[in-house]
């Protein structure tokens, strides 16, 4: 995993660990979800009727009884783990997160203390320990977070949410690499994502646009979708996503 990409993963984890902006419990799904497994499937084979033999890769996410994301993993088509993150919570505050890939630990972040609107962490990567600070500010439904490493600002994120708590826009800036991304989300009346616009800017200022449309096909008795198809900006199918959802009893 590239260093900047890994820092972004850590950044997302740190933001979710803070007390300012919180992702919705259970990933915004209905009910007390314990685990979700997503199967990403090639649409051509799926639509042809050959279901079950066409998985490209899989994602799995587990939640504790309070809805905190305690584990997530990316797997290949037969379920072998390629990368994973494990989070530990105390009183709904993330105190430790470990990132692994290829069977080895890439880094671990440990919560040290809170100083006003700053969260202080130690990042351990191999024999190197880096002091990371997350500074949070908020106004109405806008949440801003900045991550610094040993005093140098690395990443910045701005999230705008709707009245239900879902992110309608997300801006991420890699301050060292001079790259950024802007994401605009549209939700239906049941708060399911139906359109996503992403503009990415590289260090030269060149922009690329990605548009994703989502069509939902099946839902379970809790009202959570279990099958969906995504389309690109040309309205061509990209993948089918099938979800298996397990609930706490």
Regions of interest found by a model, annotated:
Residues 17-249:
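Buried hydrophobic residues that stabilize the cores of well-folded domains
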Residues 4-14:
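Sec-dependent N-terminal signal peptides
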């Amino acid at each position: 995993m590239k260093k900047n990409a890994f820092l972004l993963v850590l950044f997302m984890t740190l933001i979710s660990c803070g007390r300012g902006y919180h992702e919705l419990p259970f990933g915004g799904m209905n009910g007390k979800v314990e685990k979700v497994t997503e199967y990403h499937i090639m649409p051509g084979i799926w639509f042809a009727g050959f279901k079950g033999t066409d998985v490209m890769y899989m994602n799995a996410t587990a939640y504790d009884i309070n809805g905190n994301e305690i584990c997530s993993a990316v797997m290949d088509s037969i379920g072998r783990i390629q990368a994973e993150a494990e989070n530990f919570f105390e009183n709904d505050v993330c105190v430790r997160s470990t990132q692994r890939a290829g069977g080895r630990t890439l880094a671990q972040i440990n919560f040290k203390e809170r100083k006003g609107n700053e969260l202080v962490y130690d990042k351990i990567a191999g024999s190197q320990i880096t002091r990371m600070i997350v500074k949070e500010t908020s106004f109405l439904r806008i949440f801003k977070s900045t991550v610094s490493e040993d005093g140098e600002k690395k990443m910045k994120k701005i999230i705008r949410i709707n009245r239900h708590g879902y992110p309608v826009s997300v801006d991420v800036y890699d301050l060292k690499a001079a790259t950024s991304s802007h994401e605009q989300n549209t939700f239906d009346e049941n708060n399911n994502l139906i359109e996503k616009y992403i503009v990415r800017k590289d260090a030269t200022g060149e922009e690329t646009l990605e548009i994703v449309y989502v069509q939902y096909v099946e839902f379970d008795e809790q009202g959570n979708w279990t099958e969906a198809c995504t389309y690109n900006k040309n309205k061509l199918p990209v993948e089918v996503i099938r979800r298996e959802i397990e609930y706490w009893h």
